[in-house]
Every structure is written in structure tokens, then in C-alpha cells.
Amino acid sequence: MAVPKRRMSRANTRMRRSQWKADNVALQDVKIDGQTVRIPRRLVKAAQLGLVDVEQF
């Protein structure tokens, strides 16, 4: 684990943290029960197996 050489000020810490931004999830078009829905790629298999309710999306 990385260990800092010196203490980082509260202002610098908060400035660094504020630069972090989450990315939008890429959606895929999937046809389930004759209905086309856009869901995240990681949920495609579960949606096809019926484990996820696609009405939420």
C-alpha cells in the first residue's frame, strides 16, 4: 500500500477528491420478450435468464 511521505493539507485533500467524477454507464439494446430495453452490459445475461426485472429500466 502506498504511504505518503508527508501530510497532505485538508484543502489539498478535498480539492483532489472533488476532481473525481463517475462515468455514465454504457447501455446496450437488448430484446427481451419481444420488447427492446436499454440496460447495462453487466445485467444482460441476468435479464435474459429472467433474474432481473427489466421493467425498472
Curated annotation (Swiss-Prot):
Transmembrane segments: none annotated. It comes from the Bacteria. GO terms for molecular function: structural constituent of ribosome. It holds the Pfam family Ribosomal_L32p. One of its GO terms (biological process) is translation. GO terms for cellular component: large ribosomal subunit. The keyword Ribonucleoprotein applies. Keywords: Ribonucleoprotein, Ribosomal protein. Belongs to the bacterial ribosomal protein bL32 family. HAMAP family: Ribosomal_bL32. This is Large ribosomal subunit protein bL32. It comes from Corynebacterium efficiens (strain DSM 44549 / YS-314 / AJ 12310 / JCM 11189 / NBRC 100395). The gene is rpmF.
